[in-house]
C-alpha cells in the first residue's frame, strides 16, 4: 500500500507540471509563433557557424606532380549530406567500370596546378660528383704511382752509391800504389788527390788517376743501371742488362807504337766496328776467332795486322782473358782513337778528327743487374790486367815491315778521306770566293765619291785579269808536260 501511495503522488506531480507547461500555449497561433522563432534562431546559429569557420584547403601531390585541391565547408557539401554521399559512393563502387567514360581524362593538362605552383624537378647528381671513395680512384692511382716512383728513386740511388763505394774501397789500395794522384775532381787549379769518387749523376761515378810513367792519366767510369728510374726498372724485367766499368787510359805519344787492336765478345766487336772511327777504317775484316791463342769461343779478335795480335796475345794476357771472359766486354788498343764516328747533317767533315793513343777497357759487373757490394771484389783482377796492359803497350814495338805497313794504312785512310771531301772542299772554297766578291762589290757601291768608285772598279777588274792570265799559264805548262 505504501508503494502504491507513493506512485500516486508521483503521477500527481507530473500532471501538475504538464498543465503548467501547456498553459503557455492557449491557442494554435501562439504555438506556431513559438515554433517559427525557435527554428529561426537555430538557422541563424547555423549560418554564423558556417561563416565563422574558415575554409580549409588540402593540396595533394602525386609522383607525376599533379595537384588536387579540396575545399571543405562548401554549402553543397554540408555535414547533413555526408550520409547520402556515402550511400552514393557505395552504389558507384558496385557498378562496373567503363573505360570509355574516362577516355582522354589523363591526357588533359592540369592548368590550375601550374598556375598555383611551379612543378617540382628532381636533379640526378652524376656519379663522379658524389662524395665517395669511388669518385677519387684516378687521384688515388696517381698518388700511389708518385709514392712508388719516389720510393724507387731513393732506394735505387742509395744502392748505386753503395756499389760505387764498395768498388772504390776494393780498388783504392791498388790505385794508390800505381798512381800518385787518385780522385782529382778538377775544381782546383793545382792537381790534388781527393781520395773519393766524383758523382756525375745518380748512376754514373768518375775517378781520375794520374802520375804514372808512360801514360798521361786514367779515367775510370762506373756506369750503373738506372735503378732510380722506375720505368727503367720495369724495362729491365723484360731484358736484363749488367752494370759496367769503363777504363780509358791515355798513353804518351812516344810510349805506344802505331797499331789498332781489339778483343772482346763477338757482339761487342761488331757494334764497335760500326760505331768507332778507327776500327771501321783500319780493321775492315770481320772479327776472327781467338781459338788459335787459347781464347774461349765467346771472345773474338779484331786486328790491323797479324803481327800485332801475336805480340799482344802473350801468356799472361791470355790468362786474364780466359779466366775472366764472362766479365770482359771489350779491350781496345789504338793509336788513332777519336771516339765514335762524327755524323754531320751535310756530308762528311772537312777535317780529320784529332786522335789520341788510347787503351779502352769495358768490363761487366757480375750479377746481371742483381748486383751486391761484395760482387765488386771480383773486378779486382781485371784492374791488374789494366796495369799490365799499360806496361805491355809501352814495351811492344813493331818491326820494320810492320811499321811500313802501318804507315801505308794511315796514308791510305788520309787519301780516301781527302777524296771523299774533295768536292765539299771545292764547294766551300767557291762559297768563300763568292762571299769575298760580294763584299767587294758592296764596298764599291757604298762609295759616295764617283772618282774613287771608278778607281776601285778598275782595280778589281785588273785583279780578275791577272787571275785569268795565271790560269792560262798553268794550262799551257800542263800541256807541255803532257807532250
From Swiss-Prot:
Glycosites: 178
Instruction: Write out the coiled-coil annotation as residue ranges.
Output: 450-483
Which PANTHER family did the record assign?
ADIPOCYTE-SPECIFIC PROTEIN 4-RELATED, PAT COMPLEX SUBUNIT CCDC47
**Keyword entries, A-Z:** Chaperone, Coiled coil, Disease variant, Endoplasmic reticulum, Glycoprotein, Membrane, Signal, Transmembrane, Transmembrane helix
Q: How does it assemble?
A: Component of the PAT complex, composed of WDR83OS/Asterix and CCDC47. The PAT complex is part of the multi-pass translocon (MPT) complex, composed of three subcomplexes, the GEL complex (composed of RAB5IF/OPTI and TMCO1), the BOS complex (composed of NCLN/Nicalin, NOMO and TMEM147) and the PAT complex (composed of WDR83OS/Asterix and CCDC47). The MPT complex associates with the SEC61 complex. Interacts with VCP, HSPA5, DERL1, DERL2 and SELENOS.
Q: Which GO terms describe its cellular component?
A: endoplasmic reticulum; endoplasmic reticulum membrane; membrane; multi-pass translocon complex; protein folding chaperone complex; rough endoplasmic reticulum membrane
The protein's location, in the record's own words, is: Endoplasmic reticulum membrane; Rough endoplasmic reticulum membrane
**Which regions are flagged for Basic and acidic residues bias?**
105-118, 430-472
Question: What protein am I looking at?
Answer: PAT complex subunit CCDC47
Q: Which sequence ranges are listed under topological domain Cytoplasmic?
A: 21-135
Q: Please state the pathology the record ties to this protein.
A: Trichohepatoneurodevelopmental syndrome: An autosomal recessive complex multisystem disorder characterized by woolly or coarse hair, liver dysfunction, pruritus, dysmorphic features, hypotonia, and global developmental delay.
Residue intervals on the Lumenal side: 156-483
Q: What are the transmembrane regions?
A: 136-155
Amino acid at each position: 500500500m505504501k508503494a502504491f501511495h507513493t506512485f500516486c503522488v508521483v503521477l500527481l506531480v507530473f500532471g501538475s507540471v504538464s498543465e503548467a507547461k501547456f498553459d503557455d500555449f492557449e491557442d494554435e497561433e501562439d504555438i506556431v509563433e513559438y515554433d517559427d522563432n525557435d527554428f529561426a534562431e537555430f538557422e541563424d546559429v547555423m549560418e554564423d557557424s558556417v561563416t565563422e569557420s574558415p575554409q580549409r584547403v588540402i593540396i595533394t601531390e602525386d609522383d607525376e606532380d599533379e595537384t588536387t585541391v579540396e575545399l571543405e565547408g562548401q554549402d553543397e557539401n554540408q555535414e547533413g549530406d555526408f550520409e547520402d554521399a556515402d550511400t552514393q559512393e557505395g552504389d558507384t563502387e558496385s557498378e562496373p567500370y567503363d573505360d570509355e567514360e574516362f577516355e582522354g581524362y589523363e591526357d588533359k593538362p592540369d592548368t590550375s596546378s601550374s598556375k598555383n605552383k611551379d612543378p617540382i624537378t628532381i636533379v640526378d647528381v652524376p656519379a663522379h660528383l658524389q662524395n665517395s671513395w669511388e669518385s677519387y680512384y684516378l687521384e688515388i692511382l696517381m698518388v700511389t704511382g708518385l709514392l712508388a716512383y719516389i720510393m724507387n728513386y731513393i732506394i735505387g740511388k742509395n744502392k748505386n752509391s753503395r756499389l760505387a763505394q764498395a768498388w772504390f774501397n776494393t780498388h783504392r789500395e791498388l790505385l794508390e800504389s800505381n798512381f800518385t794522384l787518385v780522385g782529382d775532381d778538377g775544381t782546383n787549379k793545382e792537381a790534388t788527390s781527393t781520395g773519393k769518387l766524383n758523382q756525375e749523376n745518380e748512376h754514373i761515378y768518375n775517378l781520375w788517376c794520374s802520375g804514372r810513367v808512360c801514360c798521361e792519366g786514367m779515367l775510370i767510369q762506373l756506369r750503373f743501371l738506372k735503378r732510380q728510374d722506375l720505368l727503367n726498372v720495369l724495362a729491365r724485367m723484360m731484358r736484363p742488362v749488367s752494370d759496367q766499368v769503363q777504363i780509358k787510359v791515355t798513353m804518351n805519344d812516344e810510349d805506344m807504337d802505331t797499331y789498332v787492336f781489339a778483343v772482346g765478345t763477338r757482339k761487342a766487336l761488331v757494334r764497335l766496328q760500326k760505331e768507332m772511327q778507327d776500327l771501321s777504317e783500319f780493321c775492315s775484316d770481320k772479327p776472327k776467332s781467338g781459338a788459335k791463342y787459347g781464347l774461349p769461343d765467346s771472345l773474338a779478335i779484331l786486328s790491323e795486322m797479324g803481327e800485332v795480335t801475336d805480340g799482344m796475345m802473350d801468356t799472361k794476357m791470355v790468362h786474364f782473358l780466359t779466366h775472366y771472359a764472362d766479365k770482359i766486354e771489350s779491350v781496345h788498343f789504338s793509336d788513332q782513337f777519336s771516339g765514335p764516328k762524327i755524323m754531320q747533317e751535310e756530308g762528311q767533315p772537312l777535317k780529320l778528327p784529332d786522335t789520341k793513343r788510347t787503351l779502352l777497357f769495358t768490363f761487366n759487373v757480375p750479377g746481371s743487374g742483381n748486383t751486391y757490394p761484395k760482387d765488386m771484389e771480383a773486378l779486382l783482377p781485371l784492374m791488374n790486367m789494366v796495369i799490365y796492359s799499360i806496361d805491355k803497350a809501352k814495351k811492344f814495338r813493331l818491326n820494320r815491315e810492320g811499321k811500313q805497313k802501318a804507315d801505308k794504312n794511315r796514308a791510305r785512310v788520309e787519301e780516301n778521306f781527302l777524296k771523299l771531301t774533295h768536292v765539299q772542299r771545292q764547294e766551300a772554297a767557291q762559297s768563300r770566293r763568292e762571299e769575298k766578291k760580294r763584299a767587294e762589290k758592296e764596298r764599291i757601291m757604298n762609295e759616295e765619291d764617283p772618282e774613287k768608285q771608278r778607281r776601285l772598279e778598275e782595280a778589281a777588274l785588273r785583279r780578275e785579269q791577272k787571275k785569268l792570265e795565271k790560269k792560262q799559264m798553268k794550262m799551257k805548262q800542263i800541256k807541255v808536260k803532257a807532250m
